[in-house]
Amino acid sequence: MYPRHDDVSLFQRFVNDHKLEEKGLPLYQLAQLEGTDQVMLGVDGTKIIDMITQAVREREKMAIYTYTTPYTVYEKINEFRTMFQSIKNCTPVFVFNGIQYSPDSAEEFGREKNVVPSEVAALTGTDSSRLSNTTNVRFAEIHKKTANRFVVEEDVEGQIIRIFRSEFKNTIRAPYLAWAQLSSFRHCNHRHISEVYGCLELLAFPGIDRVVTNINPTRGTFDVVYKARVLEAARLSEEDLSSLILVESRSRVMRTVTLKFSSLEDMIKKVVRYKGSTIGASFAQQLHEEAIRASEANRMRASNQRGAAFRNLSAFASPVLTLTPPHCLPLHFLYGIPGFPHADAESFVGLPLPPVLYYIMSAGLLSPSLFAAVSQETVVDDWPLVDSIKYRDVAETVLPLRVQTIYQLAWTMSRGLGSISWFRRYNVLPARVSKLHVPPAIQLDGWALHSVTVPRGLHLVDVMEFAHLACSVDQVIYNTMEETYAAILLQSLDLLGYLTHETQDLHEEGQSSEPSTFGRALQLCSVPTLSEYTVLLIELARTNAISTEPFRITTEEVSPRDTPRDIVFASRVLSIIPLNVSGPWTAPIDAELAAFSMLSRMISRSIRQLLEAITTLMFSKGRTHVPLHRIGEIQRLLPFSTPVEFGCGVLVEYMLMKDKCTLKDLEEAFPECTYLRHDLATLFYFWDLAVQVLQRIETKENFCVDQHCLSSANERMKRAQKNLNILTGVRETYY
């Protein structure tokens, strides 16, 4: 949950005050790409995410306690889909942001922003905890603050991009900044788009003469802001305007600089130009000098402001992809912007990566934070919903996997990594950043799959039948998509510890590898589409994330929860199973389950990044004959692509807490769950599987869960299943 600033920029106010937005132009006036009859519309992913965020905050104010991916996200995506498909002879080119700025260890974040209000902490998934009961005046301020906490995090953004890519093939991630990449698409030698739709900040970039700010498909019109009109109204050069727009931007992808000006005109008037620099650069230099003169008490804040200003100006130096050598270069090099004073982007976005890695990332289906960690030599945590002791413990437990994943990717580059830093999102500032040791090098094995028939559409449990085919990685190159994908899953499971083996030569006979205890537990899953959740369950148990202890989710004293421990246990185990929903959540909520989901998401994303790193290694090291341009097909198949939800945990909690709960009770309490009987069949099947899995991985050395609590929870679940009359055969369970 990232901190977010929503105040309007001075430039936005300037455009509004001077009525510089031309409204109601007919859609046929959208420019076509030269030599074609198509409008190639560059779509700014920053604006897409901003509009989705705003829609969720308005329509689902308590979203952070209901869904990981709120229902409004899908509604808004559908609105965009309808809008762009309604424009005749228009091909949208979606460009989303890639690697973000390097983290700032001095970033301010208050304790009150990642705790739960006591009124919300008291809601425990029962009838009295229904979201519809929180619409009174007492909750009005809570709704407002809670709504502002919602942001689209990386895993949800990845889901959004996957949906857009399934509808629009021209959907990519920029190496760094989407605005810079769209600017490069307007360069005379690399022109791929004829118009841009997005944020006003696009006017700061070369090659962009106007920005489409709104499209009304019903009326067949669009609104637009011309750079020429802005320059005329502001009486500025293009360089001055560009620097001003960036330095005072309030976009989520930029750093907020505190301004002491009443308007853009006031800023232009009062900033003293520094040695021929632009106004924006002069203001940044002014902040630099103020930081030098600042008192000890104010020096850190002044230094942060200076850094934010220079960081925003470095957007002009963002590397962009091109189809011609060198394939990736800073934007200001592409346009030949002379005398650019802050072109060194390395201090802000990290060291450059090999162009092939940017190309692999450009498909939009991989996590930019994985590549950012290699580039910036920093492992960055997400902002937690609640900064709890359990969250910190699990984060430390998962860290070795995350670090090993990063080094596996880094070792493929000619430039290795030294000691990297761990950047934690904790309330305690001194505890945020620490150095990490270089992990032991792990040589991943290969898999002799050429001698077997590998089917399509494999899931994690399916590849376990090939567990005995391990071989030296240098002895095998995969020939087909199926072999390559199976090898990616096997290598990932191997690094996670689901296989135990001694590598033998291909010519030697006998079994060289076999499933470990965790691998045999995974093989208990007879519904392959649920094997992803089986792995997640095992990893939650291995990291001791599944417990019955309450989370400290508020700074205020609240009445102790009276939820029995075995119900807490069952609801957390089953919270990872998704529900089919058809609308915004109005059912009961439980903030503790929302806090627990942060652990599930952390582990899920860590496994996902491992799979992504192995996929990248497979292609960048030439271990497959599958052409590089088909890597997107494999990326689409990778598991752990959908953000982990937690609504099922609330459903289980309600079901077990309500005496003799009936299907009608559940349908009334959870009206959004339109396939409830089917979801319950999946839920009870997975519970039976979870009991077997947790018992299988339990050893004297590894007490993953409280077996007494597991047994008690199992008895409750059996009674509930009998009372609801839910069948759990394989035919009834499909995902």
Swiss-Prot record:
Establish whether keyword Cytoplasm is in the entry: yes
One Gene Ontology cellular component: cytoplasm
Residue span of region Interaction with PBP1: 475-722
Q: Which InterPro entries does this chain map to?
A: MKT1_C (IPR022039), MKT1_N (IPR022040), PIN-like_dom_sf (IPR029060)
- Describe the inactivation phenotype: RNAI-mediated knockdown in the bloodstream form is lethal. RNAi-mediated knockdown in the procyclic form has no effect on viability.
Q: Does the keyword Cytoplasm apply?
A: yes
Q: Which domain of life is it from?
A: Eukaryota
* Gene Ontology biological-process entries: post-transcriptional regulation of gene expression; regulation of translation
The alphabetized UniProt keywords are: Cytoplasm, Translation regulation
Pfam families assigned to the protein according to its UniProt record, in alphabetical order: MKT1_C, MKT1_N
A GO molecular function annotation here is: 5'-flap endonuclease activity
Q: Where in the cell is it found?
A: Cytoplasm, Cytosol; Cytoplasm, Stress granule
SUPFAM superfamilies from the UniProt entry: PIN domain-like
Q: What does this protein do?
A: Involved in post-transcriptional regulation of gene expression. Promotes mRNA stabilization by recruiting a complex containing PBP1, LSM12 and XAC1 to mRNAs. Recruited to mRNAs by sequence-specific RNA binding proteins. May regulate translation through interactions with the EIF4E6-EIF4G5 translation initiation complex.
Its subunit composition reads:
Forms a complex composed of at least MKT1, PBP1, XAC1 and LSM12. Within the complex, interacts (via C-terminus) with PBP1; the interaction is direct. Interacts with RNA-binding protein ZC3H11 (via MKT1-binding motif); the interaction is direct. May interact with RNA-binding proteins CFB1 and CFB2. Interacts with the EIF4E6-EIF4G5 translation initiation complex via EIF4G5; the interaction with EIF4G5 is direct.
> Which family does the UniProt entry place this protein in?
Belongs to the XPG/RAD2 endonuclease family.
State the name under which the record lists this protein. Post-transcriptional regulator MKT1
What species is given as this protein's source?
Trypanosoma brucei brucei (strain 927/4 GUTat10.1)
